[in-house]
């Protein structure tokens, strides 16, 4: 854990998943105060939203400094996103690859919408720094996770709201193994164990089966990425 490099408040996109939990720790190590926002858009794995409370309790237990920095946790319902999307994340259909090379778990515009709503909330609360877990190093190919997309959106929302926002993506160039390592660097074994036990990644919302990397079906693309990253992390660290 390090001293904050900023006396400002950050807003973290916090879904209850591995990546967003790691980003929350990253923000807590760098900002004086941190607020969170999560989105309920009719996702099949909405159980991840329920994981946030236990994760936050765990963060407070790991560090009294982190506990003192944790601010409001917001939840925003966006049912319209599910209504206009026809994907395996919002419909009870089998996960498969599409003809365009993208898995049918891709929700068009999801991160663009999330970040725009986050910026609108940040504007109202006087926050300029927004943190998201987007990554194009070890991911499913979603175009709204790419670095150039995030940079373009940062410019657009800054212009559109006449406010200089900064979109931080600390995982952008890290693979999943490096994301596990970052969690360890930030909060030690306690944070790694917290993320394993209480974060949620599985697209199917499965929490009945426990693996060494956490809970999930073990078969969907999200579980596969998380499991592979865990194995590589354990190999690298011995």
Curated annotation (Swiss-Prot):
GO terms for molecular function: ATP binding; ligase activity, forming carbon-nitrogen bonds; zinc ion binding. One of its GO terms (biological process) is queuosine biosynthetic process. Its cofactor is Zn(2+). It is an enzyme of class 6 (ligase). Pfam families: QueC. Pathway: Purine metabolism; 7-cyano-7-deazaguanine biosynthesis. Catalyzes the ATP-dependent conversion of 7-carboxy-7-deazaguanine (CDG) to 7-cyano-7-deazaguanine (preQ(0)). The gene is queC1. Keywords: ATP-binding, Ligase, Metal-binding, Nucleotide-binding, Queuosine biosynthesis, Zinc. SUPFAM superfamilies: Adenine nucleotide alpha hydrolases-like. HAMAP family: QueC (MF_01633). InterPro entries: QueC, Rossmann-like_a/b/a_fold. Zn(2+) binds at residues 202, 217, 220, 223. Binds 1 zinc ion per subunit. Its EC number is 6.3.4.20. Belongs to the QueC family. PANTHER family: 7-CYANO-7-DEAZAGUANINE SYNTHASE. ATP binds at residues 14-24. It catalyses: 7-carboxy-7-deazaguanine + NH4(+) + ATP = 7-cyano-7-deazaguanine + ADP + phosphate + H2O + H(+). This is 7-cyano-7-deazaguanine synthase 1. It comes from Rhodopseudomonas palustris (strain HaA2). The keyword ATP-binding applies.
């Amino acid at each position: 854990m390090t001293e904050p490099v900023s006396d400002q408040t950050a807003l973290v996109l916090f879904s209850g998943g591995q990546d967003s939990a790691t980003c929350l720790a990253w923000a807590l190590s760098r900002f004086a105060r941190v607020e969170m926002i999560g989105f309920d858009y009719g996702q099949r794995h909405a159980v991840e939203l329920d994981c946030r409370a236990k994760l936050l309790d765990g963060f407070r237990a790991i560090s009294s400094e982190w506990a003192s920095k944790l601010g409001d946790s917001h939840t925003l319902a966006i049912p319209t996103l599910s209504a206009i999307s026809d994907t395996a994340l919002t419909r009870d259909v089998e996960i498969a690859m599409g003809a365009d090379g993208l898995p049918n778990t891709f929700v068009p515009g999801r991160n663009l919408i999330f970040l725009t709503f986050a910026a609108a909330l940040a504007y109202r609360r006087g926050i300029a720094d927004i943190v998201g877990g987007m990554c194009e190093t070890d991911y499913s190919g979603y175009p709204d996770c790419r670095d150039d997309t995030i940079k373009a959106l940062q410019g657009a929302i800054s212009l559109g709201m006449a406010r200089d926002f900064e979109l931080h993506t600390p995982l952008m160039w890290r693979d999943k193994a490096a994301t596990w390592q970052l969690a360890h660097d930030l909060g030690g074994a306690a944070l790694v164990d917290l993320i394993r036990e209480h974060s949620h990644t599985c697209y199917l919302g499965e929490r009945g089966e426990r693996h060494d990397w956490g809970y999930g079906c073990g078969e969907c693309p999200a579980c596969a990425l998380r499991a592979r990253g865990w194995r590589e992390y354990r190999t690298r660290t011995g």
